[in-house]
Amino acid sequence: MPKLYIKTYGCQMNERDSEQVARMFVQKGYTMTDREDEADVILFNSCSIREQAEQKALGKMGLLAKQQRHRPHVVYGMMGCMAQSKKEELFKELPRLDLVVGTQKYHRVFEHVDGILRARQERRMDELQTAFSGTHVCDVAEEADSQNRIRDHLNPGVRSTAYVSIMQGCEMKCAYCIVPYTRGAERSRPIRDVVDEVKMLADAGVKEVTLLGQIVNRYGRQMETAGGKGGFVQLLEAVHEVEGIRRIRFVSPHPIGFRQDLVQAFTYLPKLCSHIHFPMQSGSDRILKMMRRPYRNETYLDLCSRMKQARPDLSITTDIIVGFPGETEEDYLLTRQAVEQVQFDNAFIFRYSPRRGTPAAVMENQIPEEVKEARNQDLLAVVNEIAIRKNRDLVGTVQEVLLEGPSKTNAARLSGRTSQNKPVMVDAAPDLAGEILPIRIEESTGFTLYGVPCPSRG
């Protein structure tokens, strides 16, 4: 029985896409493996958001191909955003590569791999030097309806959480971001199809779903409003009605299109988790304008305030870029000030990384790496201090925790998350995995909480 190995880089959307690909192969008789040296097909799902992610994927794929020269039958494929961006160029960088598949062609991966294998068998390519030739496939063309092809799941009955892709594409075109060029225009799935997928997951035992989109709150912009509610809130309400689903999350929204109906949803949809990941990117209006993010920081801060009024226990996490071209010390200090004002529960802080083909890559006044690093470390210290204090304040409280499964670092413990997306390690029996239980928080080690189940009553 042939074996498939998939390595995924980047965001939750990539993880979901990889799962769809894996499901297709398993349906055709493949088994999954976590060992590259026993795989017959090796696929990487790549990320282009930063250069480091691209270099990791390129380096790893090149190393694997060299290490396995004695296994000429293995098919090597690159999928995802880097595949979409670099296209045939990847065959020059990775001579052993067989397949390049773009972001709208995940549903074609199996047929391409199968075609490559059949071609090799027909030609009886037994010699190492000829086994690599004539099998290159590059499929990066746009395909209508591709957003509706990411709908199948791999073994949904063995876990309590799942990602659900509700749309693809992005049309905001921030100056630093390659995603609009790799993911295409915005395309939304019908509400009915999303709800059917969520029902299937609930029937399999899933209790928490995370709705995915490049800018998730722009879902269904072409839909008619109903009672003053846009398409995304209509979808949230429909998913909320699915029996068996206990928690709903969504990532990632954008201040543009973040309507009051979405703020209000936090007041009447109890399954909506008390957490939002809400990218700020900069606290400077001047830098936001240069980034082509068409809002003022005041708008962002006001949205944070209104969301916390709607859901007082809401935790807010964010993304921030430091060292964007032209960022002055004053601009950076405005970002630092905004972080202190919002009191984020956590933040991903990135040093600006030029991406080929984006407007920011050719802007003047590129910031020296040592300045980027200094600002990164300074802001990280501010964020960490806030996050550690907030977690410490939870010691002694009782939190509802979804126990997701064994801890990766200690199999004797279960790991889970609160509604606020705080990771919790729990001393609990393995058969409690998948349950949502009240957990007394006994310790905080900074970013991780530790607790025990509360005694059952009666």
Swiss-Prot record:
MTTase N-terminal domain location: 2-118
EC number: 2.8.4.3
Subunit details: Monomer.
Keywords (A to Z) from UniProt: 4Fe-4S, Cytoplasm, Iron, Iron-sulfur, Metal-binding, S-adenosyl-L-methionine, Transferase, tRNA processing
Note accompanying the cofactor annotation: Binds 2 [4Fe-4S] clusters. One cluster is coordinated with 3 cysteines and an exchangeable S-adenosyl-L-methionine.
Residues that coordinate or bind [4Fe-4S] cluster 2: C170, C174, C177
Cysteine pairs bridged by disulfides in the record: none
Recorded catalytic activity of this chain's protein: N(6)-dimethylallyladenosine(37) in tRNA + (sulfur carrier)-SH + AH2 + 2 S-adenosyl-L-methionine = 2-methylsulfanyl-N(6)-dimethylallyladenosine(37) in tRNA + (sulfur carrier)-H + 5'-deoxyadenosine + L-methionine + A + S-adenosyl-L-homocysteine + 2 H(+)
HAMAP family: tRNA_metthiotr_MiaB
Top EC category: transferase
Main location class: cytoplasm
Segments forming domain TRAM: 392-455
Classification via Gene3D superfamilies: Methylthiotransferase, N-terminal domain, tm_1862 like domain
GO molecular-function terms, A-Z: 4 iron, 4 sulfur cluster binding; metal ion binding; N6-isopentenyladenosine methylthiotransferase activity
Location in or out of the cell: Cytoplasm
Pfam families: Radical_SAM (PF04055), TRAM (PF01938), UPF0004 (PF00919)
Superkingdom of the organism of origin: Bacteria
Binding positions for [4Fe-4S] cluster 1 per the UniProt entry: C11, C47, C81
Taxonomic path: Bacteria, Pseudomonadati, Verrucomicrobiota, Verrucomicrobiia, Verrucomicrobiales
Alphabetical list of CDD domains matching this protein: Radical_SAM
Designated name of the protein: tRNA-2-methylthio-N(6)-dimethylallyladenosine synthase
Assigned GO CC terms: cytosol
Role according to the record: Catalyzes the methylthiolation of N6-(dimethylallyl)adenosine (i(6)A), leading to the formation of 2-methylthio-N6-(dimethylallyl)adenosine (ms(2)i(6)A) at position 37 in tRNAs that read codons beginning with uridine.
Native species: Akkermansia muciniphila (strain ATCC BAA-835 / DSM 22959 / JCM 33894 / BCRC 81048 / CCUG 64013 / CIP 107961 / Muc)
Domain Radical SAM core, first and last residues per copy: 156-389
